């Protein structure tokens, strides 16, 4: 089985697909999308959306790779606007030798560190206002942010931008 894949999702044209800086031997690159994309390194898998919501469509693939990538022993999810800069085999040996899953903190992203769901919500609102394309329903986001702690803001916590899995 020893097949390995790096995968991403782009629905509704929210992100631009970034080409990897490093293309490791023995790894496939797959992008699940509902738009016409072209890439030198990514295999574009155009799919019919499950939902009428881009965020939920993306999460269908992000959170459930075993349903869509069952032939792969190892899978690494990255956000569509992220890129591979180093050998993912090192990531597998460092983080999955004694675990089945590893999550990676958005705050460690050197180009765009964020550690707070409230900051993320503000960025989604700003992006939507500028571009007319919201990542999710703004009213739903506001409701979730208010409901989270009865209107009180909590200490910011990590967000997941990448996930590695041992699928065997």
Describe the function of each predicted region.
Residues 1-168:
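Glycosyltransferase catalytic domains, chiefly GT-A lineage
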């Amino acid at each position: 089985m020893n097949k390995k894949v790096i995968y991403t999702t782009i629905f509704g044209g929210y992100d631009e697909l970034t080409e990897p800086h490093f293309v490791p031997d023995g790894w496939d690159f797959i992008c699940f999308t509902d738009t016409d994309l072209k890439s030198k390194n990514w295999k574009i898998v155009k799919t019919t959306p499950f939902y009428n919501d881009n965020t939920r469509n993306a999460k269908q693939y992000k959170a459930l790779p075993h349903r869509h990538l069952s032939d792969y022993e190892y899978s690494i999810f990255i956000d569509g606007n992220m890129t591979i800069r180093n050998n993912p085999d090192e990531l597998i040996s460092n983080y999955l030798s004694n675990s089945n899953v590893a999550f990676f903190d958005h705050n460690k992203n050197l180009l765009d560190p964020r550690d707070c769901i409230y900051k993320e919500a503000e960025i989604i609102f700003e992006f939507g206002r500028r571009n007319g394309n919201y990542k999710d329903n703004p009213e739903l986001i506001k409701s979730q942010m208010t409901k989270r702690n009865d209107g009180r803001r909590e200490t910011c916590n990590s967000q997941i931008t990448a996930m590695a899995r041992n699928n065997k």
